[in-house]
Amino acid sequence: ILEHLSGYKNSKPVRIGNDAYHQKQNDSFGYLMDLIYQYYRLMPGTLDEIEDMWEMVKSILSTVMEDWKKPDKGIWEIRGESRHFVSSKVMCWVALDRGAKIASMLNKYGYSERWQKEADKVWQDVMTYGWKEELQSFSQTYDNMAMDSSLLLMEPYGFIAADDIRYHKTVKAVKKALLHKGLMYRYNSEDDFGLPSSAFTICTFWLIRALFVIGEKEEARC
């Protein structure tokens, strides 16, 4: 806390730093690996350059292979106890899936097969422990029944198809639980600050897209 500085409209105190810097956030590997894969997929002329990044790709995937089974703080940087967040598992699947595809691009089929097999294990794990029959929806974590907007990202990253009834039901459940006055909350579980009290803009756009891809175009427009 910097007591000697003021912010916008003389607001005080100024705070610096972020307690999340030391957290384990397993979802981050998926975003990075998807970015690397999409870059080379969309710019095939740069395929030879993949070799320059191959060591980094192997390092990332080695970590994912080791850590995907472990609890983490999740996409929202929860400061409480580490949990098995469904969205983190999904993004670990993304990392392994994209790594397998990159390995295939380089004809490194041993790596591709190994990573794809591990991706299949993650997929089955999520389907077994993330889907809740009682809710007829995926839930925020393996051990709770809360809704989370990040579940809407399962389809755009290719983890589940838009026409899969489980995704359709999850979209509906997330919307029912988290949409308030036209805006989406991130989740409805308590964190270290209590229950969420404000919306999160990007989550509203995730919902709009999700409604559109499951065929609810009128709802998406509203």
Feature annotation, model-predicted:
Residues 1-126, 149-153:
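The feature captures the catalytic groove of carbohydrate-active enzymes
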Residues 1-23, 59-71, 119-204, 222:
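Extended glycan-interaction surfaces of carbohydrate-active proteins
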